[in-house]
Amino acid sequence: MESNRGSQNGIQLLLGAEQEAQHIVNAARTGKQARMKQAKEEAEKEIAEFRAYMEAEFQRNVEQTSGDSGANVKRLEQETFAKIQHLKTEAESISHDVVQMLLRQVTTVKN
């Protein structure tokens, strides 16, 4: 009987140790889940902050470039006007010579 009682105590001791181990595992699992949830929330917060920052940068760049496009258009119009005036001036200065050359070519008879 003594051996029976000893084995009963051993079994009870093992069952108690198994339950304690199960509690430890469950506590560790719960802690891990809590840490994972917290890490996920922190990551989502950082992502949202970064997204907001990048959106603000993009909007600022759009405002700067769209504001500059009006100035660029005006500058290009001025440059184009200046080039047209320059070409007109050059054309006026050589138009007499071109007319004379054309008249000479038309009126000269070649055999």
Swiss-Prot record:
Keyword Protease: no
Highest taxon, organism lineage: Eukaryota
GO molecular function: ATP hydrolysis activity; proton-transporting ATPase activity, rotational mechanism
Any one of the GO CC terms: vacuolar proton-transporting V-type ATPase, V1 domain
Pfam family, one: V-ATPase_G
Keywords: Hydrogen ion transport, Ion transport, Transport
Assigned protein family: Belongs to the V-ATPase G subunit family.
Reported function: Catalytic subunit of the peripheral V1 complex of vacuolar ATPase (V-ATPase). V-ATPase is responsible for acidifying a variety of intracellular compartments in eukaryotic cells.
Subunit structure, as described in the record: V-ATPase is a heteromultimeric enzyme composed of a peripheral catalytic V1 complex (components A to H) attached to an integral membrane V0 proton pore complex (components: a, c, c', c'' and d).
The protein's name in its UniProt record: V-type proton ATPase subunit G 2
Protein source organism: Nicotiana tabacum (Common tobacco)
Upper taxonomic lineage: Eukaryota, Viridiplantae, Streptophyta, Embryophyta, Tracheophyta
